[in-house]
Amino acid sequence: MRRIDIRLGLALLLISTTLAAAELPLERIKLPPGFAIELWARVDNARQMALGHHDDKGGTLFVGSMQAGKVHALSFGANFRVQAVTVVASGLQRPVGVAYRDGSLYVSAVSRILRYDDIERRLAQPPAAVLVTDRLPGETHHGWKFIAFGPDGKLYVPVGAPCNICEPDPQRHANILRMNADGSGPEVYARGVRNSVGFDWQPQTGELWFTDNGRDLLGDDRPPDELNHAPRAGMHFGFPYCHGGNLADPEFGARHSCAEFTAPAQQLSAHVASLGMRFYTGTMFPPEYRNQIFIAEHGSWNRSRKIGYRVTLVRLQGSKAIAYEAFASGWLNGENAWGRPSDVLVLPDGSLLVADDHAGAIYRIIYRR
């Protein structure tokens, strides 16, 4: 009887996903030749994605959310098709960020980091949360955050400025923190970071790269969003004094010269709301994509003509950015957006997942040789 129930559940999931795909105009998405996009799963308010345990039989993807207050687990098989979607946490305050380490799921919830142990063995009856830390700032303005473990084993946690533009305590806000997995030993890794969301480590060097969202109310085309490179601790990236490496802030810029700070590795378009980013480490895509950066641009809210709502590609030569271009676009139709990319993640088969919190979807981009 249980085998019949499982088969019925998988059939219903396939039917519901097929029907949902018909409701989303995926034919509008423009990709380079040879690429294709499909609906992979429906997940309410999907934000950061983190890959759990996986092997040749399948694995688990964890997905955070904002307004939904939930964390989902997506179980997929050897063919990388989703078999089940399970809510593993709910009722949390903006549990946007998710990270996985040694069988445990870590979740950010504004001022707190929570841990769910032995999670994949307990998806049907998730464990109680263990408090890792509750000492992060409680402001919700830029208070939600992605999280991830670095190559040094530390948990990295961006803490945004609690404002559009202000001069906050640099030990408390506008920085990127790192701490031990148990929450001990927190330290500021990078300063002058207004609102970083996505970050990843370059495969060849192990060095940190991250997106940062520029301030508002300086017009349609300034300041730029930023892609930054932090090869070592202690660097300052300019906020609130300097934006984009060369634009002095009209309120705070007189206090420091832009020359005092680290300029972005790549200026991104103004107000695109650059969120999740990942280095492409797969082998499915052509070789020229290997170790390049994909960025989910959530899209503008404060511009006379909307911009963003796409996935972009930053091409690198070593550790130098040499090009910034659209990779997947079409979620914006004129001034109407039907989707908003929020994160990207490379599956073990080399396909690229794109989370969309507006459409409540996760897409899968594949390359057909």
Where are these regions (language model features)?
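Blade-level signature of beta-propeller repeat domains, shared across WD40, Kelch, NHL, RCC1
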Residues: 345-369
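Conserved beta-propeller blade signature
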Residues: 57-63, 104-107, 154-158, 207-211, ...
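Hydrophobic core register within WD40 beta-propeller blades
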Residues: 49, 98, 147, 196-199, ...
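Short loop/turn segments immediately following the C-termini of beta-strands
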Residues: 65-67, 110-112, 118, 160-162, ...
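Beta-strand-rich domains and repeat architectures in extracellular enzymes and scaffolds
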Residues: 38-66, 272-279, 295-296
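Asp-box/WD-like beta-propeller blade repeats and closely related beta-sheet repeat scaffolds
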Residues: 99, 111-150, 158-162, 185, ...
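Beta-propeller domain segments
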Residues: 22-33, 56, 144, 161-164, ...
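Surface loop/turn motifs at the tips and blade-to-blade linkers of beta-strand repeat domains
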Residues: 39-44, 86-91, 132-139, 188-192, ...
